[in-house]
Structures are given as structure tokens and as C-alpha cells.
Amino acid sequence: MARLVHLTAVLAASIRLAAAATINHDFNVTWVRANPDGAFERPVIGINGKWPIPTIECNLGDRIVINLNNQLGNQSTSLHFHGLFQNGTNHMDGPSGVTQCAVPPGSSVTYNFTVDQPGTYWYHSHNDGQYPDGLRGPLVVHDPEFPYKKEVDEEIVLTLSDWYHDEIQTLIPQFLSKTNPTGAEPVPNACLINDTQNITVSVQPGKTYHVRVINIGAFAGQYLWFEGHKMRIVEVDGVYTKDAEADMIYITAAQRVSFLLTTRNDTNANFPFMASMDKALFDKLPADLNYNSTGWLSYDKSKSYPDPALVDELNPFDDMTLEAYDGMELLPEPDQNVALDVIMKNLGDGVNYAFFGNITYKSPKVPTLYSVLSSGDKATDPAIYGEHTHPFVLKKNEIVQIVVNNLDEGRHPFHLHGHNFQAIYRSNESAGTWEDGGGAAGKTFPKVPMRRDTLLIYPNGNMVLRFKANNPGVWLFHCHIEWHVISGLVATFVEAPMDLQKSLAIPTDHLDACKAGNIPTEGNAAGNTKDLLDLSGQNTPPDPLPAGFTTRGIVALVFSCVTGILGICVVAWYGMSQPLEEATAAVATLVREAQVTGSGTSPNHDDGNAAATEAGVLRRRT
């Protein structure tokens, strides 16, 4: 029986391969102008002179070829195909400084890879925090064997996103500034659905729609619900699930959720649906910001589009209760444990940075993948990749467990490149670290865990992820709040590096892009090719804050104290001055009255002296 199943799978794969197509795209990346929220027109990054950028669609087994030409003029770029494993094509993953050099203005590269995963994905720039300026869009891989195919009549793709009126290169210096010592992230100016607002989606009664939802935003998680309709979740992050009914879902930045939505049997009304940004993520709550974006399921265009009803609470479906459709059971106990503590703190330049443990990420001078390919037998030594890339070298096929302890007050969506992971445990908010809770003792992990590539961790909580290192490559693990990528919340997995050396060669056009950008392509993280353990000259973060008080700090403290004391004195003097003036005026009035009403004679000098004495007493008392 097992042999028959295997032969059937091989036959199905062979048929798909024979039917596979090559999907070609020429992407000229340019600046265009757009006003998606109707409030502010600004430059955005488009493709071929248009924005929003196109949806990439293909069938399972197809080859995608994208010829990217950077015509921005003032910025480098790259493309990452979020959620695709790039098995055998690690150099097509896209993060600059990791698997490629950034593509400078005027240069071109080709991304060429086969898609062997069905589901809902997206693509975006993975260079210098760039994608919130508009270089992000859906990527959909259709599956002829989609397990719910017989129930589906039509398909709908919805993107959710936050939106900024300022360009990211304007916001980054404001964010990474000593004038922002708490690391407060810039708050978006708007919430968008399909890169617009007040969208209508035409539907027909009595049909079932396969709705693919992608959060392509930079920061905000989004709550989503449809009035008068239920959602049956069938996929998260490219992994099919046993169907699960939900009234409301929560989607972090970078996550995807697919569900079946069956329309009503009549056309008596149109129904609103709502995307609402998670305000808990924002340090500031601008009074003029509308956190919501409303769309409508349009049954009849001639009928009105009602305002959405108020909801009593935001109570979304718990994605940890989902079960993978394929029944893949919990992986065995790990061969390697990776513990990552999320910390936000200031360095010596006064700027607030994000850390895993005591390391904030700094991009190496040589892309990490290129260091793997040029380092011979030293490729298994994590030291050559530089401590500031936070590298972990993994052996092929070992089971890896990541324990993330969130020592921060905020929520974080963590994404793993090159894999999806089994989400085997997530604590509640304020549960403390995994170790505080006794680790695995007393906990029951799901037999068939949910798998996905991006998962939310709660404030001051923890989570445990598990995956098999069966995809040789250099893969990032990072928070997908783009501000936290910029501030360093990134680690690097170097997986089966010796296998990579045997199987991978970098295309000439990718090396040419490095040359155009004056980026070395050999050596360790510092670009040293002679002594791979010599990291002198590597990119480093600012020095830590000095212990105790520096001379400048002592002087600043003294002046602050003096200023504070003077301030208190001024306040006290001001508070006493008015009663004193009133008392003095009252005494003077008494003296004048005594002079006028006294026995008709000249003013009594003794009484006058007494009055003056009384005024002196009042003055001293006050």
C-alpha cells in the first residue's frame, strides 16, 4: 500500500512537471505618484510606471522568471518572495546583505526559481526598510489539488496594509534618533484594503468564495471581520489546515490567511467588512487617525452601503488551535536549541535598538551566503559570519527548536525564511520566560501542530517553534515589524553550509550588481579573505552605554539639579508675591483711614509707626 501511495505521488509530480509553465515578468522599478487614502499624494515605488504593483500568479510547479531593473535613481533595491522556501535556490531569496547584494540604481538582476509550494504568499523589497514605500504585492500559487476545490466557486484576493504619508528614508532618521530614546515607532497615517479605501467587492448570492488575505503592511497587525458572514479558515501562510470557523481573525504584518466565505441566498442588502489596525502596537494615538478601513460585499449596486456596526470587543480566532491538513505530527525532541530573548535598549549614541539577547543585527560587508561559498571548510564556524549577524550554524536534517522570550512590552510577529515551523507553544501575555514557566515540564504539545512561517508573540510572553533543517541555505529569523528589522531584531541561520558549497553557484548578473555597488563577494563578514577569523573592520553597532556616570553625565546632572532648584524657587516666589502685595495694600488703606478719621488733629505718628511695624510683620510672615 505504501508503495502504491509513493508511486501515485511520483506520477502526480511528473504530470505537474510536464504541464509546468514559465512565467516571465520584466519589472522596471520606478518612482510614481499615488494618493491611496485620498488625503496625501506622495512618491511611491511602482513597477513599469504603475502602482499598486502587479499580483504574481502561477500554478504549482511553474517556473517564475523576473527580470528586475532598478530605475529608482536614488535607492538600491531587492525582491524577497515571502514564504517560498527557495529549496535549491537560496540565492533567489532576496534579502540584501544576506543572500545577495542590493541592486544599485541602473543595475539589473534576474530572479529565476521553481515554485513547489501551493498557497498564498507575497513579494516585497528586502532592502533598507524600503517596502512600506509601495514595493510589495500578492503572490498566489494555484493548486489543482486544493483540498477544498470542489466547494469553491470563485476566488478573491485582499491585501491589508498600513500607510505612511512620509517616505521611509525620511522616517528612519527620526526613528533611529537620540530624540526618540524610547524607540517609539512611527504611527501610520492610514489603513488600506487593496491599497485603497471604501472598497466594494462584487459577490453573487449562494456562492462560496476562496478569500486570500495578506497583510502587506510594515507595522500594524489587523483585525478583520465580515458582518453577517462566517469565515472557514483553510490555509495559513501556505499551509492547508483542517477547516475552522471564525467570526473575526487577527493577521500580523506578513501573515496570510485563506478562508471560505459563503454568501447569503438573497440580494436584499450589502454588507460591510472591516479591517482595524491594532492600536496596542502604537505608542501614540493620534486624534485624527482613523484606525479602520471599511469595505463592502456588494450584492446589489443599486442598494445602499451601510456603515459598519460597532463591536463590543475585539476577540479574534486563536490560530494556535489550527491543525495542519496533512496531519504532520510533532517533530521529535530537538538536536539543537536556540534561545532568543527580545530586548529593546539604548546604546552609546542614545538611540534605542532591538536585540536578540545582547546582539543587535548589523549587515556584514560580504553577503552571508557569499561568505559560505568562499570560505571552504571554515564555513561551519559561525565566527566567520561576524557576531553582529547573530549566526547559528545548523547541521543538515537536525531538528531545531527556537524558544523566543519576549522581554518587551510590545507584540512581535516573527518570520523564518526558508521554512515553515511547527508552532508548538505560545504563552499568554505577561507569562514571563519559557524557563520561568518551567520549560516543557507540565505542558502538552499538540500532536499535529499548526505550521506557518510567521507567528505573533505576546508582550512579556514566550513561544516555542520547531523545524527540520532540510533546506541548505542562509535564512533569516526576524521580527516582521519593519521598524524592528531596521533597529536590529534579526538572527541568521546558516544551514548545511558544506552542502551549499557543492550545489550552488551565483549567477553573473548578481555578481555584477555587487561590483556596481562596490560590495565584496568573498571573505568573512569583514571582507577578509586571508584570515577568515580576523573580523577587524566588520560593521558594528555603536558602543554600549558606559557604566555609571561619565564626566559629561555628571556635569549634566549638576546643571539639571541647579535648574530644578531655581525653578522651584521661582514658583514659590511667584506664589507668595500676590498675597504680600494684597496685605501691604490693606495696611496702607488702614493707615489712610486712621489719618482721616483720627480726632481731627494731625496724623498720629505713633499709630503710623505701629501700622508700619504691622506691615513689617506681615512682610516677614509671608
UniProtKB/Swiss-Prot annotation:
EC number: 1.-.-.-
A cellular-component GO term for this protein: high-affinity iron permease complex
Cytoplasmic side: 574-622
Residue numbers binding Cu cation 4: 412, 479, 484
Signal peptide range in chain numbering: 1-20
Family, as annotated: Belongs to the multicopper oxidase family.
PANTHER family in the record: IRON TRANSPORT MULTICOPPER OXIDASE FET3 (PTHR11709:SF361), MULTI-COPPER OXIDASE (PTHR11709)
Protein name per UniProt: Iron transport multicopper oxidase fetC
Gene encoding the protein: fetC
